[in-house]
């Protein structure tokens, strides 16, 4: 069963706009995730696979209003569930929305696709000597302030005992399939 939390950074990085009201910027980011989810849904449907977009915002012409029981039912019926619109609230990242949805949907894991190979001991974009960490606990990631995901996402997964987050580089498209098949790439973050 597959649920995918969709990001919107390719369309909107509004949190970096200092002059804009942060609530408006976050709302624009949520809308960007919905645009992306509709594009992903179209690509999946063209492959002959059923997919439904869910949003916490009322947008019934484009997507179903999110309820965990409905999303679980769709997944149990073989559909791919696309979760867009973040948590529906400003000031919460897509990482936190992914953790929240994973807990609500009783997921076994979160696969976090990003632009680096996993969790590093420092930002590899700023420090070429940064070292990849293959295995780390939620608490260690929080204590060391490792920012590949926001600390509130790690904290929620820890508190709710989500078995693991797998952080991997999704720039290599083959990695999505590899991680879905259980290959131990990237970093395993766990309780």
Question: Which residues are covered by each model-predicted region?
Answer:
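C-terminal catalytic "cap/lid" subdomain
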Residues: 1-191
């Amino acid at each position: 069963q597959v649920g995918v939390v969709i990001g919107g950074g390719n369309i909107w990085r509004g949190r970096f706009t200092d002059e804009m009201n942060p609530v408006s910027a976050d709302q624009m980011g949520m809308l960007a995730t919905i645009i992306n989810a509709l594009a992903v849904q179209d690509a999946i449907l063209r492959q002959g696979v059923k997919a439904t977009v869910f949003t916490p915002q009322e947008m019934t012409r484009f997507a179903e209003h999110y309820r965990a029981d409905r999303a679980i039912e769709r997944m149990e019926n073989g559909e791919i569930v696309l979760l867009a619109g973040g948590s529906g609230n400003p000031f919460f990242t897509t990482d936190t929305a992914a953790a929240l949805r994973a807990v609500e949907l009783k997921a076994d894991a979160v696969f976090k696709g990003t632009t680096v190979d996993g969790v590093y001991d420092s930002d590899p974009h700023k420090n070429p000597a940064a070292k990849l960490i293959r295995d780390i606990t939620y608490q260690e990631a929080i204590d060391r302030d490792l920012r590949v995901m926001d600390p509130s996402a790690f904290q929620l997964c820890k508190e709710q005992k989500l078995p693991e987050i797998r952080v991997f580089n999704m720039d290599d498209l083959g990695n999505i399939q590899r991680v879905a098949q259980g290959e131990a790439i990237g970093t395993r973050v766990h309780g």
